[in-house]
From Swiss-Prot:
Family: Belongs to the V-ATPase E subunit family.
Signal peptide range in chain numbering: none
Organism of this sequence: Dictyostelium discoideum
GO molecular function per UniProt: protein-containing complex binding; proton-transporting ATPase activity, rotational mechanism
Oligomeric and partner information: V-ATPase is a heteromultimeric enzyme composed of a peripheral catalytic V1 complex (components A to H) attached to an integral membrane V0 proton pore complex (components: a, c, c', c'' and d).
Gene Ontology cellular component annotations, sorted alphabetically: contractile vacuolar membrane; endocytic vesicle; pathogen-containing vacuole; phagocytic vesicle; proton-transporting two-sector ATPase complex, catalytic domain
Function (record text): Subunit of the peripheral V1 complex of vacuolar ATPase essential for assembly or catalytic function. V-ATPase is responsible for acidifying a variety of intracellular compartments in eukaryotic cells.
One Pfam family linked to the record: vATP-synt_E
Phylogenetic placement of the source organism: Eukaryota, Amoebozoa, Evosea, Eumycetozoa, Dictyostelia
Alphabetized SUPFAM superfamilies for the sequence: V-type ATPase subunit E-like (SSF160527)
Ion transport recorded as keyword: yes
Protein name in the entry: V-type proton ATPase subunit E
UniProt keyword terms in alphabetical order: Hydrogen ion transport, Ion transport, Transport
InterPro entries membership: ATPase_E_C (IPR038495), ATPase_V1_Esu (IPR002842)
Length: 233
């Protein structure tokens, strides 16, 4: 084999090796491109999912915050409504108190009321010795009302009572426009067993009891029946 043939054969072998190398390089490049594309797709998908989750998380937080804000606004509105309603109820009480303060103006009618209040106290206390405390301005009416109540108690119950009107202690005076201290619209406080048992039977205390009992009715009159209430007395 001469040099020409040897060189030709070497060139052929070189070309074969180069072609094999090129094919291998192309194969590696193709595989690398495929892997890169696959990895890029995987990363993109993961990032996409991550972004979606972050968005959903933020969206949920926004929705939760919206609900919290709405709930706060509703609570504020409810409190405002309740405040207005309570103010209306207080106005009702004030009007009732104004009328209550005028009851003692009619002396005959007021004396009958005093007698009935004292008699009720006798029945409630059910004691043999009772002390009555009233307003200083009612002193004259109180003596007569106490005597009449004791007589009625003896007639109805069949027992005599040792009753006295306190001449040293008095209930607060009636309401006046130029007076801001404690007031009492009238009535009495009865006590027995040296003050250990007390029956508060003032007009003011009776108004409080009536108001507590009638508050549901007053609310209904002012605002209508509650849609959430299932039971009624």
């Amino acid at each position: 084999m001469d040099d020409t043939q040897v060189n030709a054969q070497l060139d052929q072998m070189k070309n074969f090796i180069l072609q094999e190398a090129q094919d291998k390089a192309n194969e590696i490049k193709t595989k690398a491109t495929q892997e890169f594309t696959s990895e890029k797709g995987r990363i993109f998908q993961n990032e996409k999912i991550k972004i979606i989750k972050e968005y959903e998380k933020k969206q949920k937080l926004i929705e939760v915050q919206k609900k919290i804000n709405l709930s706060n606004e509703l609570n504020k509105s409810r409190l405002s409504v309740l405040k207005v309603r309570e103010e209306c109820l207080r106005d009702v009480i004030k009007e009732a108190q104004k009328k209550l303060a005028t009851i003692s103006d009619d002396k005959d009618k007021y004396q009958t009321i005093l007698k009935n209040l004292i008699y009720q106290g006798f029945v409630k206390l059910n004691e043999n010795k009772i002390q009555v405390v009233g307003r200083k301005e009612d002193a004259g009416l109180l003596e007569k009302a106490t005597t009449e109540a004791a007589a009625q108690y003896k007639k109805n119950v069949g027992k005599s009572i040792d009753v006295s009107v306190d001449k040293e202690r008095f209930l607060p005076q009636g309401p006046k426009s130029d007076y801001n201290g404690p007031t009492c619209c009238g009535g009495v406080i009865l006590s027995a067993l040296e003050g250990r048992i007390i029956c508060k039977n003032t007009l003011d205390s009776r108004l409080e009891i009536c108001f507590d009992q009638l508050t549901p009715v007053i609310r209904t009159q002012l605002y209508g029946a509650s849609t959430s209430r299932k039971f009624f007395d």
